Amino acid sequence: MMSRLNSVVIKLWLTIILIVTTVLILLSIALITFMQYYFTQETENAIREDARRISSLVEQSHNKEEAIKYSQTLIENPGGLMIINNKHRQSTASLSNIKKQMLNEVVNNDHFDDVFDKGKSVTRNVTIKEKGSSQTYILLGYPTKAQKNSHSKYSGVFIYKDLKSIEDTNNAITIITIITAVIFLTITTVFAFFLSSRITKPLRRLRDQATRVSEGDYSYKPSVTTKDEIGQLSQAFNQMSTEIEEHVDALSTSKNIRDSLINSMVEGVLGINESRQIILSNKMANDIMDNIDEDAKAFLLRQIEDTFKSKQTEMRDLEMNARFFVVTTSYIDKIEQGGKSGVVVTVRDMTNEHNLDQMKKDFIANVSHELRTPISLLQGYTESIVDGIVTEPDEIKESLAIVLDESKRLNRLVNELLNVARMDAEGLSVNKEVQPIAALLDKMKIKYRQQADDLGLNMTFNYCKKRVWSYDMDRMDQVLTNLIDNASRYTKPGDEIAITCDENESEDILYIKDTGTGIAPEHLQQVFDRFYKVDAARTRGKQGTGLGLFICKMIIEEHGGSIDVKSELGKGTTFIIKLPKPE
């Protein structure tokens, strides 16, 4: 009900009805009042005219009695005529009740003294009570000199007339006026409702459009063909709606691009408002915050507070869960609505860069050590031979053998470095052939039989001699040589090294398993990285360059396969090679 009363249509309709009703009431009151006044005045004028004629007739006549009788025939109500010579000496015995009351009014009302004393015409409304009802009469006193007396200058011609006819006429006019007003009001009501509905129809359309715009629907654009202010308003609103749609689309596009860029960033991004609440974050930041420890959280909060205080960009290093991050916090004047300031936090994972830098340092140290050792041996033994320190043929032969071994070792080291450089520049070429896997594993068995016996290792091969794989013999020889050499370094006498074949629906699988020292969990994710080397204190024998497993991974991936490692510290390590089956 209240919503209907709040409608513009109802308000406009009620306003028009109220105005028209007020005007009709005022006009009706004015008309009725005027008609009452008009008929009263007309009646008074008519009575006055009758009184004047009677006064003139009586004054000019010699026979007063005949003149009075004749005068009674001239007026509408002959019984309403009274000619009073002296109002103080009038007998009321033969008068009717009405005339008695009229005579009493003349005698007792001081206004009528002006008729006798000043010769003025006086009119008064007199209410007569008769038979339990009241009736209003108009009583007019008109001066005349028809009969002289010693008490006053003038006599008086008094005529009274019943106003019931005027009241009936006024009542009829009132009823007609009210009926006319009601009819006019009814017509006005219908017309006003139609007019207000028609006028407000464009406004209702604009309201519907505004509601849809507030809900994000900009497609609805009402057509208002009028040329008035409402039509102009509709055109302006349609134009505004179109511009809002364009701006919203632009903002939405910008937001989508921004969100896509932020979510695609490798850095974690956080938006912090003045209340220290996160109002913006990407996936990387969510992952970091899910795994953050209390110390790192306290570190981050301190840096955010420092940025709020200094309003300057802060950049600090953070180490958490064996990973390394660079945290950058920047102060922003307006980060959300209302002009509130905030801080944007950028967390960049620098673990790979840190590890790569560390690996480069280790690589330089290892390569320097690896190069220095054979070079020192080559120099020492050759100087011994050249200087004649070693003269016995057997000693010379032994020294030359050592020189040869160190030369081969130096050559192998240089070849590994050259292979990596060549693979980076030209890529790795693999010539796969469908051939028995036994050909490769038999070769490995012969190659490492003596080494296993010398090291006290139990090396076993378990494979199906008839099974054929698709692989490059030389490249896979390089892979297995590296893996078995690594297994030999991380084992002790009595440990086992097992090479086993298996398969699934789409892949051939090769396991190289040892029961050696194993690899710590923090190293597992990096063993295939370039230049990476596990703790040298747990290895036995000569050290490599940290390129072997990196080269193995490149070879296996070039075959279209994968290589993985599983290890448990103190229990051993298993390398798993998967190659696609021959088509």
Swiss-Prot record:
Main localization, broad class: membrane
Top-rank taxon: Bacteria
Major enzyme class: transferase
InterPro entries found in the cross-reference section: HAMP_dom, HATPase_C_sf, His_kinase_dom, HisK_dim/P_dom, HisK_dim/P_sf, HisK_sensor, Light-responsive_reg, Sig_transdc_His_kin-like_C
Molecular-function GO terms, alphabetical: ATP binding; phosphorelay response regulator activity; phosphorelay sensor kinase activity; protein kinase activator activity
Transmembrane segments: 12-32, 175-195
Cytoplasmic side: 1-11, 196-583
Record localization: Cell membrane
Keyword Disulfide bond applies: no
Keyword tRNA processing among UniProt keywords: no
Listed GO biological process terms: osmosensory signaling via phosphorelay pathway
Reactions the enzyme catalyzes: ATP + protein L-histidine = ADP + protein N-phospho-L-histidine
Keyword annotations from UniProtKB, A to Z: ATP-binding, Cell membrane, Kinase, Membrane, Nucleotide-binding, Phosphoprotein, Transferase, Transmembrane, Transmembrane helix, Two-component regulatory system
Start and end residues of each HAMP domain: 197-249
Modified residues (Phosphohistidine): H369
Bilayer topology: Multi-pass membrane protein
Induction: Up-regulated during anaerobic growth.
Functional note: Member of the two-component regulatory system SrrA/SrrB, which is involved in the global regulation of staphylococcal virulence factors in response to environmental oxygen levels as well as biofilm formation. Also plays an essential role in host-derived nitric oxide resistance by regulating hmp/flavohemoglobin, an enzyme that detoxifies nitric oxide by converting it to nitrate. Functions as a sensor protein kinase which is autophosphorylated at a histidine residue and transfers its phosphate group to SrrA.
PANTHER family associated with the record: HISTIDINE PROTEIN KINASE SAES, TWO-COMPONENT HISTIDINE KINASE
Official protein name in the record: Sensor protein SrrB
Organism per entry: Staphylococcus aureus (strain COL)
